[in-house]
């Protein structure tokens, strides 16, 4: 449901403030940190913690509005902006018949691309929620930059079953400083002092919203798993068979209560293209809500396994990162 002012004649040159609120159609309560876009001219932004938003210096006219939130059906509509504008958007929760989920067989990816709703509506809905989680993180990282500190621990694993601590430190990462996914280019040479060293880049959450990633991967529903005692839908993705170079396969888990992403697992395909001595590279990433509906990385655990034992029986390396703090430059929903 949408409520808006009517455009009076002769007001095309006036500029006004467009204010509004996004609420749940079921409860009437404001939905915090929903994404609202006013087109043309205005970029997407988050609502505040009460579901309110504002666009300033809006010329009178007709605009396309898009409203998104994880766990809710997207809303697209048209509004007419006049002298005084008050908007109210009601979003309805996503409903997926879990009993109707068909677990498709794992197979070679020969027809990559986003799932077709006509062929598998449940998969298409869950895929859209996965994409929305990723897109929201992308918006958060780029428009509301933040820094987060991770405690890092590096270890070596040996064929005897022993582990040896190698190094530990605390690293600070900027949310908008990251590698971007390119099909078949997840293994590159490093920069600076690492220019002669091959580096494996495992895609991050924003990459799951990238059309390039969608076009080169197949997606399927792999069933329901229990995480922390709650049901989660598992979506698996496979790199296209046509990709000759190393890329990634993986899985993503979304809670069925609100379709928030909780975990992703990533595996390097064709690891021998990265290094003849490597047999596997994998990582598990878990997320937490820093603010309602807004995810940040909580823990990363990466494992690199050697094809043959090295000196002293070395068979692998692990890297664990744990979140210790997040600092926003500007909180989502705040004006600049």
Walk through the language-model features, giving the residues of each.
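Beta-strand-rich domain onsets/edges
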Residues: 6-17
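A short, amphipathic beta-strand motif
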Residues: 16-24, 51, 89, 101
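Short, ordered, surface-exposed loop/turn motifs in non-cytosolic proteins
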Residues: 16-18, 25-40
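Short Pro-Gly-centered beta-turn/loop motif in secreted/extracellular proteins
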Residues: 29-32, 54-62, 70
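A short, solvent-exposed loop/turn motif at the edges and junctions
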Residues: 38, 62, 66-78
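Short, acidic Ser/Thr/Gly-rich low-complexity loop/linker segments typical of extracellular
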Residues: 41-54
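Structured interaction patches on ligand/partner-binding surfaces of diverse proteins
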Residues: 72-87, 94
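Structured extracytoplasmic
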Residues: 96, 100-248, 270-274, 291, ...
């Amino acid at each position: 449901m949408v409520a808006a002012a009517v455009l009076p004649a002769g007001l095309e040159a006036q500029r006004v403030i467009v204010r509004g609120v996004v609420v749940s159609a079921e409860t009437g309560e404001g939905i915090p940190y929903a994404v609202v876009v006013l087109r043309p001219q205005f970029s997407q932004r988050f609502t505040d913690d009460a579901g309110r938003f504002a666009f300033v210096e809006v010329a009178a006219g007709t605009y396309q509005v898009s409203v998104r939130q994880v766990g809710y059906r997207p809303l697209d509509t048209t509004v007419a902006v006049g002298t005084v504008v008050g908007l109210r958007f009601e979003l309805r929760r996503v409903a997926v018949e879990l009993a109707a989920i068909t677990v498709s067989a794992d197979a070679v990816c020969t027809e990559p691309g986003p799932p077709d709703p006509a062929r598998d509506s449940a998969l298409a809905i869950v895929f859209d929620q996965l994409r929305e989680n990723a897109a929201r993180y992308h918006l958060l990282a780029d428009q509301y930059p933040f820094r987060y500190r991770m405690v890092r621990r590096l270890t070596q694993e040996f064929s005897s079953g022993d582990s040896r601590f190698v190094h530990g430190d605390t690293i600070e990462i900027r949310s908008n400083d990251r590698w971007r996914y390119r099909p078949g280019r997840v293994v590159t040479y490093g920069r600076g002092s690492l220019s002669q060293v091959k580096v494996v880049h495992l895609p991050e959450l924003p990459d799951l919203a990238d059309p390039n990633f969608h076009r080169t991967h197949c997606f399927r529903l792999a069933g329901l798993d229990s995480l922390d005692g709650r049901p989660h839908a598992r979506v698996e993705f496979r790199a296209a068979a046509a990709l000759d170079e190393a890329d990634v396969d993986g899985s993503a888990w979304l809670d069925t209560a609100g379709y928030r992403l909780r975990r992703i697992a990533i595996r390097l395909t064709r690891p021998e293209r990265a290094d003849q001595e490597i047999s596997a590279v994998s990582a598990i990433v878990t997320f937490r809500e820093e603010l309602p509906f807004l995810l940040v990385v909580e823990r990363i655990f990466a494992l690199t396994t050697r094809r043959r034992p090295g000196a002293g029986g070395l068979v692998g390396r692990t890297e664990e990162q744990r979140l210790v703090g997040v600092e926003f430059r500007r909180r989502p929903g705040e004006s600049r």
